[in-house]
From Swiss-Prot:
Binding-site residues for substrate, renumbered to this chain: 104-106, 128-131, 138-140, 186, 319, 324-326
Highest taxon listed in the record's lineage: Bacteria
Enzyme class: lyase
GO terms, biological process: fumarate metabolic process; tricarboxylic acid cycle
Pfam families with a match to the protein in the record: FumaraseC_C (PF10415), Lyase_1 (PF00206)
Organism: Corynebacterium efficiens (strain DSM 44549 / YS-314 / AJ 12310 / JCM 11189 / NBRC 100395)
Gene field: fumC
Name listed for the protein in its UniProt record: Fumarate hydratase class II
Keyword Iron part of the UniProt annotation: no
First-listed, main subcellular location of the protein, grouped into a coarse class: cytoplasm
Cross-referenced NCBIfam families: PRK12273.1
Molecular-function GO term, any one: fumarate hydratase activity
GO cellular component, one term: cytoplasm
Active-site residues annotated for this sequence: 187 (proton donor/acceptor), 318
Amino acid sequence: MSDFMTEQEFRIEHDTMGEVKVPAQALWRAQTQRAVENFPISGRGLESAQIRAMGLLKAACAQVNKDSGALDAAKADAIIAAGKEIATGKHDAEFPIDVFQTGSGTSSNMNTNEVIASIAKANGTEVHPNDDVNMGQSSNDTFPTATHVAATEAAVNDLIPGLKVLHESLAKKANEWDSVVKSGRTHLMDAVPVTLGQEFGGYARQIQLGIERIEATLPRLGELAIGGTAVGTGINTSADFGGKVVAELVELTGVTQLQEAANHFEAQANRDALVEFSGAMRVVAVSLYKIANDIRLMGSGPLTGLGEIQLPDLQPGSSIMPGKVNPVLCETATQVSAQVIGNDAAVAFAGSQGQFELNVFIPVMARNVLESARLLANTARVFATRLVDGIVPNEEHMKQLAESSPSIVTPLNSAIGYEAAAKVAKAALAEGKTIRQTVIDMGFVDGEKLTEEELDKRLDVLAMANTDRKQKF
């Protein structure tokens, strides 16, 4: 009985290498099953964004083949419908192949072809995975095309909007806290005063520049290899196939940055645009780490840290210490930064692995790039709405710290000289007195070099921040 049930769980499919047992209910067929058995590596498949792009690409190709008369209209319509259905995410579970597979993505291309053929068959139309679904295509142009479609779509529709949310939150706080004075710090040591708004304005500018860096990659990221087929020559397809497919993809995705590759040999042999895009995301990750770490340090305490700002209480921080609350979103952001930087290292190496007419590290590049975009987009939104928007500054405490910093002696350089000012700073620190009192006690307020009124003016910590010098963020 057990053997009978086991047999019933499978069906027999075949390809050019022979028969293969496939799970009875699976939409995939022989070539996909071989890949599943060959690559039990990580348990991680393609990103959903890539599966979506593969579905849309097959639909676009079928439409062009239908319009040219190369593909029967009924078959084309069945492929188009199935491809669009895949793009909704409904069939993501039918893409079981590990990301660590053949480096061209051939296995995943055939996975897509087979699933589309099975969906079409279930809806009453027989189509062949190779002859019909893959008409005018090769894995060598479809898989990189889908990768670039997914990456461009992720950048335009998710990553850039997510970063704009974070930029807006930081910029709002920069304006709100423009006059909230605090001690500046360099080398983690006391420095001359700044305002909390100036610091957050710097953070906002970092994110804005990150957005601009990502946007700058789009003209190259959006170049698509489709039409080059096996090696870039376009064998087995028409000269206008690639351009027409790209036009369909623009229509299907709404992403106007998509365009046919200017040189199909470059577009298949190299993945430089993915390396560039990943590098731009790495810069954002570096910025995000710095911002999150600064905020974490400013919020440290509540009693034995800097305690300059209060972070939102999001969840209990300890299973043993009652009442403890931790900067969990800062820690999330810094971990995401580490992952994105690591992903970029793999992408950079993988990008170097193009021998002659084809890069053969595309699946891992696609997975890492799309994961990085997703992680940064999600983190940016959550970091903005659940952390930055809820920060409360401890204004009086920050002002006290700023006024007690030895570095506020700096504006006295032009009145009493650098060496004398240094003596004041050291004496104030050693004796536990304010800079103002120390200057007076050391006899520098003599009515000639320095009056008491001039001293107070020079020691105005907010004035030291030069908030009238507006900065762009």
